[in-house]
């Protein structure tokens, strides 16, 4: 077995780790906003999936059921956007290393 190539593998792994850290830092600043109820509810997530903003139209304060439905819809859409973005970043990162 030729162990001389392990140094190259170690360097490749270090490069992947560094790129992943950079992408995660950049992703943290990415904002995904979803709206429901014609914009009556708006939620924003950062790229890490943390809820960073929530807006609810005052007219919904009287209608708890509608507010719950709109909140669930907006939150689910926002979560899906974050997950889709994560998948795209992972595929892009793997694609970059496949070129090496």
Curated annotation (Swiss-Prot):
A molecular-function term among this protein's GO annotations: DNA binding
Compartments it resides in: Cytoplasm, Nucleoid
Tagged with keyword Cytoplasm: yes
Record's keyword terms, sorted: Cytoplasm, DNA-binding
Domain of life of the organism encoding this protein: Bacteria
Gene3D superfamilies per record: Nucleoid-associated protein YbaB-like domain (3.30.1310.10)
Single GO cellular component term: cytoplasm
Keyword Cytoplasm (UniProt): yes
Functional summary from the UniProt entry: Binds to DNA and alters its conformation. May be involved in regulation of gene expression, nucleoid organization and DNA protection.
Subunit (UniProt): Homodimer.
NCBIfam families reported for this sequence: DNA_YbaB_EbfC (TIGR00103)
Similarity annotation: Belongs to the YbaB/EbfC family.
HAMAP family xref list: DNA_YbaB_EbfC (MF_00274)
Protein name: Nucleoid-associated protein HPG27_32
Species of provenance: Helicobacter pylori (strain G27)
